[in-house]
């Protein structure tokens, strides 16, 4: 089974490579409403002072 994650434009998505079983979206802390990056990832990154990550593990949940 391969996860599908949305790309930055939500109408488009990609099939994740094996081993990348999370979808994520990344926000700048200065603007938490508009994601600046979306895709597949293997481990959810930690949030920092500048960026916030939201990760999930179902198809196109990002």
From Swiss-Prot:
One of its GO terms (biological process) is killing of cells of another organism. The keyword Secreted applies. The keyword Signal applies. Keywords: Cardiotoxin, Cytolysis, Disulfide bond, Membrane, Secreted, Signal, Target cell membrane, Target membrane, Toxin. CDD domains: TFP_snake_toxin. Expressed by the venom gland. Its main location: secreted. Residues 1-2 form the signal peptide. GO terms for cellular component: extracellular region; membrane; other organism cell membrane. One of its GO terms (molecular function) is toxin activity. It is found in: Secreted; Target cell membrane. Disulfide bonds join 5-23, 16-40, 44-55, 56-61. Shows cytolytic activity on many different cells by forming pore in lipid membranes. In vivo, increases heart rate or kills the animal by cardiac arrest. In addition, it binds to heparin with high affinity, interacts with Kv channel-interacting protein 1 (KCNIP1) in a calcium-independent manner, and binds to integrin alpha-V/beta-3 (ITGAV/ITGB3) with moderate affinity. Monomer in solution; Homodimer and oligomer in the presence of negatively charged lipids forming a pore with a size ranging between 20 and 30 Angstroms. Belongs to the three-finger toxin family. Short-chain subfamily. Type IA cytotoxin sub-subfamily. This is Cytotoxin 7. It comes from Naja sputatrix.
């Amino acid at each position: 089974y391969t996860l599908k994650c949305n790309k930055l434009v939500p109408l488009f998505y990609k099939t994740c490579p094996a081993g990348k079983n999370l979808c994520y979206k990344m926000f700048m802390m200065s603007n938490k409403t508009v994601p600046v990056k979306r895709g597949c990832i293997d481990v959810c990154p930690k949030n920092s002072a500048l960026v916030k990550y939201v990760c999930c593990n179902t198809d196109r949940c990002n």
